[in-house]
Amino acid sequence: MRWLYSTSHKDIGLLYLVFAFFGGLLGTSLSMLIRYELALPGRGLLDGNGQLYNVIITGHGIIMLLFMVMPALFGGFGNWLLPIMIGAPDMAFPRLNNISFWLNPPALALLLLSTLVEQGPGTGWTAYPPLSVQHSGTSVDLAILSLHLNGLSSILGAVNMLVTVAGLRAPGMKLLHMPLFVWAIALTAVLVILAVPVLAAALVMLLTDRNINTAYFCESGDLILYQHLFWFFGHPEVYILILPAFGIVSQVVSFFSQKPVFGLTGMICAMGAISLLGFIVWAHHMFTVGLDLDTVAYFTSATMIIAVPTGMKIFSWMATIYSGRVWFTTPMWFAVGFICLFTLGGVTGVVLANAGVDMLVHDTYYVVAHFHYVLSMGAVFGIFAGVYFWGNLITGLGYHEGRAMVHFWLLFIGVNLTFFPQHFLGLAGMPRRMFDYADCFAGWNAVSSFGASISFISVIVFATTFQEAVRTVPRTATTLEWVLLATPAHHALSQVPVLRTASSH
């Protein structure tokens, strides 16, 4: 019962991480069904059932984004580390923290239940009308309710994080003295509070269109209005997922380079700029819906500008590594892998920012490859870097360095084999969300499915990596979470520390 009623941020953070692990297993299993269906042209694993294929696509997208990456980065690492890093005894609202987590399991249960009702929600994770309005039965309604519960959990957690950072910092810890991970979580919380209510409004309108014959989107309504509302949430959501990974990579790179992050103030400003710009570029997902030329020109330009603060972060990490005495262990390899692969995902993002190019490859596998390079290799590599870096601190378990390196290289090779060929498929014109395809696409699809199998093997290796170990304090530790190793109490700190000298990394 301790886990059910616990208000300790450490217990709740660990619950988020365990929940994310099982969500990740579920989402990965669905992705393997997708890849095995697409391994060969013609009828495959699903025997030509296009509706079931689309239900799997919907489940995979929502589970991976909202029930794996977000609980792990924002809920898991954010809850466990944020109070300690700022010298707070716990979160500002511990009981609110508890309910924030316990809204997630019923949300996931509702989503899974929706797939079993009638034919399931075959709408894709975006749930565009009129398809989502015309789905019969209650499957889409259950999925909408699931998203509402998850969104409520996110908003409550974000409010808690912001109040904690604003009001519970240790005496002497000024804003610029906070670790970059804390900055990342705080900015993510702002994005959640501003973006998620817009999604909630769109989903309420979708629900009423489906059930009480309102006409917000269908009939005399405006289908494009839903896309505007959804992507006003959807694009900041990408940064909600990736900003905590930025923070983790900053901590790992600084730690294993044995020096402060290069250009600390610039890194903070870059995250702030990314957060701001993320709200004013949403319509680059909508270049094909008939926007006027001036609007298209604006969103093209604004999207390209995001590359500037993102590039600042990439070059600052590279400068930190270049000028430091680098100690290459598994967390550092995952951080370096993140930098390389996220950069490639960013480059294809700049390509897609051009409206003329985007109109050619919109809804093809080029777009799938782009956002999987940002998320499958960005956010997920950030999660693994954090797990290996702080895993001993959080769980008391160590990891086998050899098996961990096997995990890294299998995952690195697997995800590249899976998603790099999809750029070629997209440029050749293969549409996404289709369970069958022309024979000319068979070669690269076979390579992609083989890469997915390698990635799945890496998950099995990861599950065997951790082992019993003694908690140790790293000699190069510079942030407050490592103090816990000497005082492992139920709540983080029994006495609020007073900072005499500021550690800015």
Swiss-Prot record:
GO cellular component, one term: respiratory chain complex IV
Keyword Metal-binding: yes
Binding locations of O2: Y239
Required cofactor(s): heme; Cu cation
GO molecular function, one term: heme binding
Cross-referenced InterPro entries: Cyt_c_oxase-like_su1_dom, Cyt_c_oxase-like_su1_sf, Cyt_C_Oxase_1, Cyt_c_Oxase_su1_BS, Cyt_c_oxase_su1_dom
PROSITE patterns attached to this UniProt entry: COX1 (PS50855), COX1_CUB (PS00077)
Keyword S-adenosyl-L-methionine annotated: no
Subcellular location: Mitochondrion inner membrane
Alphabetical list of CDD domains matching this protein: Cyt_c_Oxidase_I (cd01663)
Catalytic activity annotation: 4 Fe(II)-[cytochrome c] + O2 + 8 H(+)(in) = 4 Fe(III)-[cytochrome c] + 2 H2O + 4 H(+)(out)
Note on cofactor: Binds 2 heme A groups non-covalently per subunit.
Sites where the protein binds Fe(II)-heme a: H60, H372
Its EC number(s): 7.1.1.9
Residue location of crosslink 1'-histidyl-3'-tyrosine (His-Tyr): H235-Y239
Assembly behavior: Component of the cytochrome c oxidase (complex IV, CIV), a multisubunit enzyme composed of a catalytic core of 3 subunits and several supernumerary subunits. The complex exists as a monomer or a dimer and forms supercomplexes (SCs) in the inner mitochondrial membrane with ubiquinol-cytochrome c oxidoreductase (cytochrome b-c1 complex, complex III, CIII).
UniProt similarity note: Belongs to the heme-copper respiratory oxidase family.
Protein name: Cytochrome c oxidase subunit 1
Lineage start: Eukaryota, Viridiplantae, Chlorophyta, core chlorophytes, Chlorophyceae
